[in-house]
């Protein structure tokens, strides 16, 4: 997958309950948003920091 492909994926919180704060790119708004990730499964549209999300997606 390319960065563009990952950034266009919808955020998936996954089925677990770890409640980890992450950032994901919202292709509809063109912004990275803070969301809660469950800690397992999900997809590549998940970044540890806002800066990582912006670097990968907001400027592609």
Curated annotation (Swiss-Prot):
Classification via Pfam families: Kunitz_BPTI
GO molecular function: serine-type endopeptidase inhibitor activity; toxin activity
rRNA processing is among the record's keywords: no
Coiled-coil ranges per UniProt: none
Domain notes: The cysteine framework is IX (C-C-C-C-C-C).
Family: Belongs to the venom Kunitz-type family.
Name used for this protein in its record: Kunitz-type serine protease inhibitor conotoxin Cal9.1d
Native organism: Californiconus californicus (California cone)
């Amino acid at each position: 997958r390319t960065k563009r492909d990952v950034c266009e994926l919808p955020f998936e919180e996954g089925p677990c309950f770890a409640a980890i704060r992450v950032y994901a790119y919202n292709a509809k708004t063109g912004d990275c948003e803070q969301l809660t990730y469950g800690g397992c499964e999900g997809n590549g549209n998940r970044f540890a920091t806002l800066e990582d999300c912006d670097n990968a997606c907001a400027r592609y």
